């Protein structure tokens, strides 16, 4: 009788199976932000600010790329300024105007 009960007993796992996890990854940073500082000289085509959306708006002599990157249209000096309470913009002042 005792032998019959033991033969019907099942061995159950006492550790969970090694399933996959949901959160086991992380993407690399996108290297966004300022690439040139206020007062720094830049050449035409230089990237000034890399961003997603328009955190900083383009001002005089600054263009905006398809990915919202701000870049210099002419040689000059970078000038960051505030537009009202919430907006910021960056301009490039030609070298003769910056002094």
Curated annotation (Swiss-Prot):
Q: Please provide the record's keywords in A-Z order.
A: Ribonucleoprotein, Ribosomal protein
GO MF, one term, reads: structural constituent of ribosome
Q: Which biological processes are named by the entry's GO terms? A: translation
Q: Which SUPFAM superfamilies match?
A: Ribosomal L27 protein-like
- Kindly indicate where the leader peptide sits in this chain: none
**Span list, region Disordered:** 13-65
Q: Which domain of life is it from?
A: Bacteria
Task: Supply one GO CC term from the record.
Answer: cytosolic large ribosomal subunit
| Ribonucleoprotein among keywords | yes
Question: InterPro entries of this UniProt entry?
Answer: Ribosomal_bL27, Ribosomal_bL27_CS
Q: Which PANTHER family match?
A: LARGE RIBOSOMAL SUBUNIT PROTEIN BL27M, RIBOSOMAL PROTEIN L27
HAMAP family to which the protein is assigned, alphabetical: Ribosomal_bL27
Q: What does the sequence similarity comment in the record state about its family? A: Belongs to the bacterial ribosomal protein bL27 family.
What is the recorded name of this protein? Large ribosomal subunit protein bL27
What species was this sequence derived from? Answer: Lactobacillus delbrueckii subsp. bulgaricus (strain ATCC BAA-365 / Lb-18)
